[in-house]
């Protein structure tokens, strides 16, 4: 905020009139065409709302802002001015009709552009709070409104500090009642619509479930969570779940909630967003555990329930230590067959469609390739992997690769797999879910390596293939150390720093970089770069040390700042003394 504040509030700062007016206009407009003098805003806090009809996030945020505006405008001096980013007047008009506040006329593009530049608007929705003198009060209005609503008025740094201090006090003094009870509500609801007093939940272990029914990860957790909840009830444990739905559609909330066995806050309860802040919600689904005393026992046990089910209860530190030991034992006992055999599913597919028994792969180094045709980085990486696979196979190594698809249909799977020379898990195979969980696949492409015993060697094999190609085989820590020693030997006589005409601002320092793009030849490089960390600038050793006076002028490179780089011979990514 400091830079924008300095520009807006500095010595050359404008008052509200000059901020919102133009030489030909001293008014703003309402959506019915009424003109409102800018000077009538004196004494009010103003929100400048940069938004546009074509922007989906804007369309979703505007109703929230309308609610806050309606609550504040009738009680305190607060006004909003819409600064449109629409591309035509019709779109502006249609969108503006949803807003109860003022706007800079669409025809005054000069003022709209000036405000964009003054407040450094680089994305929308953007809500900037100013006072009646035009001075910047808060440039994060969207985040403030989403988090605190009207409670944040007058949006000043002092008010934001006060809110933060109140939140800290609430966390320190947390009880079940402070979490779930509001001045207007002392109950939660059951799926049949009955009110359940919060007092009936006191003394129990409580799970607060933050969820959105339409979100895939929430949907995937639900069956396991229902099973977990049902088993605890059968065991007569003092445990309850309270759903805090972040749905914005009441029908979706009702359709989802009526099929669940647990309790919930009423739809659109304003304490939902407050609780999301209170527990510093960062992901969905989140299941916060409160102990019988109402204090937070664990910030999110969703993954623990997904992995261990009822074994994770009651989520104490001692229980998690037990689970850690179980996981360690599971990892140590891992074999290829424990990963890939599930009931009758004891095979993978060969290129001819034949079933290849998992038992026939035991004792080999295996790469597990999580990928999909719809994923551009996957399509870019696969040809490189095909090349490396063939090179390793030509050496008659005990090696194989298995494709684990995230494609969306059989046709896409077949088309993508036709480009691959290796094995595959059948499309839609249920083993994919357990493999993705075991290797914690958060994104694709991902390449995990298993050693001959079936133990995981690395989950970062993709980086090793990109950096070292077939030389990375068998992808072990020992092999990586051998490669690094080789490159250290190659680079031991290279200058540690150079100056180059393509980057005269700073010296370039010899740096170990896994993968980069050379800023001279624009080709990929690995391992060693002449690098400027401040500017994120990289040169291959050959590009930094090879003289090319025709391209770069005389004395293109000075080693150590003074000495010529004569005497170096560079081939590929390697430079050696002549």
Curated annotation (Swiss-Prot):
Its EC number is 1.8.1.8. Disruption phenotype: Disruption of pollen tube growth in the pistil and reduction in the ability to target ovules. Pfam families: C1_2, Thioredoxin_8. Disulfide bonds: none annotated. CDD domains: TryX_like_TryX_NRX. One of its GO terms (molecular function) is thioredoxin-disulfide reductase (NADPH) activity. It catalyses: [protein]-dithiol + NAD(+) = [protein]-disulfide + NADH + H(+); [protein]-dithiol + NADP(+) = [protein]-disulfide + NADPH + H(+). One of its GO terms (cellular component) is cytosol. It is an enzyme of class 1 (oxidoreductase). Residues 18-172, 178-321, 325-485 form the Thioredoxin domain. Keywords: NAD, Oxidoreductase, Repeat. The keyword Repeat applies. One of its GO terms (biological process) is regulation of pollen tube growth. Probable thiol-disulfide oxidoreductase required for pollen tube growth and pollen function in the pistil. Seems not to be required for in vitro pollen tube growth. May be involved in the generation of lipid signaling molecules in pistil. Belongs to the nucleoredoxin family. This is Probable nucleoredoxin 1. The lineage of its organism: Eukaryota, Viridiplantae, Streptophyta, Embryophyta, Tracheophyta.
């Amino acid at each position: 905020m400091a830079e924008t504040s300095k520009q807006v509030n500095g010595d050359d700062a404008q008052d509200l009139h000059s901020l919102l007016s133009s030489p030909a206009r001293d008014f703003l407009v309402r959506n019915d065409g009424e003109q409102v003098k800018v000077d009538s805003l004196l004494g009010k806090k103003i929100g400048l709302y940069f938004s546009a009809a074509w922007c989906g996030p804007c369309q979703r945020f505007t109703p929230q802002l309308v609610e806050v505006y309606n609550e504040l405008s009738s009680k305190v001096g607060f006004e909003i001015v819409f600064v449109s980013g629409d591309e035509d007047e019709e779109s502006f008009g249609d969108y503006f009709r949803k807003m109860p506040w003022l706007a800079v006329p669409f025809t005054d593009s000069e003022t709209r552009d000036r405000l964009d530049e003054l407040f450094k608007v680089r994305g929308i929705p953007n809500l900037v709070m100013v006072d009646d003198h035009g001075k910047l009060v808060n440039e994060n209005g969207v985040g403030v409104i989403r988090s605190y609503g009207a409670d944040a008025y007058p949006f000043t740094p002092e008010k934001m500090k006060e809110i933060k201090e109140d939140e800290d006090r609430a966390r320190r003094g947390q009880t079940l009642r402070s979490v779930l009870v509001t001045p207007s509500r002392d109950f939660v609801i059951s799926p049949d619509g009955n009110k359940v007093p919060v007092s009936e939940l006191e003394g129990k272990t409580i799970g607060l479930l933050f969820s959105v029914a339409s979100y895939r990860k929430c949907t995937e957790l639900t069956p396991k969570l229902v099973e977990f909840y049902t088993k605890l009830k059968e065991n007569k444990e003092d445990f309850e779940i309270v759903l805090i739905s972040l749905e914005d559609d009441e029908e979706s909330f009702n359709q989802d909630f009526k099929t669940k066995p647990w309790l919930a806050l009423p739809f659109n309860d304003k304490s939902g967003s407050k609780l999301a802040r209170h527990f510093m919600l960062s992901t969905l689904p989140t299941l916060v555990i409160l102990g019988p005393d109402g204090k937070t026992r664990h910030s999110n046990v969703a993954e623990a329930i997904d992995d261990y089910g009822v074994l994770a209860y009651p989520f104490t530190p001692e229980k998690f230590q037990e689970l850690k030991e179980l996981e360690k034992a599971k990892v140590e006992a891992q074999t290829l067959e424990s990963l890939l055999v599930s009931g009758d599913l004891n095979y993978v597919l060969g290129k001819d469609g034949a079933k290849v028994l998992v038992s026939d792969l035991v004792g080999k180094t295996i790469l597990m390739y999580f990928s999909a045709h719809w994923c551009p980085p996957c399509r870019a990486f696969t040809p490189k992997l095909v090349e490396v696979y063939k090179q390793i196979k030509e050496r008659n190594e005990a090696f194989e690769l298995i494709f684990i698809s995230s494609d969306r249909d059989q046709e896409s799977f077949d088309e993508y797999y036709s480009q691959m020379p290796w094995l595959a898990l059948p499309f839609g195979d249920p083993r994919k879910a357990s493999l993705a969980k075991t290797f914690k696949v958060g994104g694709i492409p991902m390449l995990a390596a298993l050693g001959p015993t079936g133990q995981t060697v690395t989950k970062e094999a993709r980086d090793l293939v990109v950096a070292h190609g077939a030389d990375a085989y068998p992808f072990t820590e020992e092999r990586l150390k051998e490669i690094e020693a080789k490159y250290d030997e190659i680079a031991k006589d290279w200058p540690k720093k150079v100056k180059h005409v393509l980057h005269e601002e700073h010296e370039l320092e010899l740096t170990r970089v896994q993968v980069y793009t050379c800023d001279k030849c624009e080709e990929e490089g690995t391992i060693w770069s002449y690098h400027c960390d401040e500017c994120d600038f990289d040169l291959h050793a050959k590009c930094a040390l090879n003289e090319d006076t025709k391209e770069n002028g005389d004395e293109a490179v000075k080693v150590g700042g003074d000495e010529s780089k004569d005497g170096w011979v560079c081939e590929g990514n390697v430079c050696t003394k002549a």
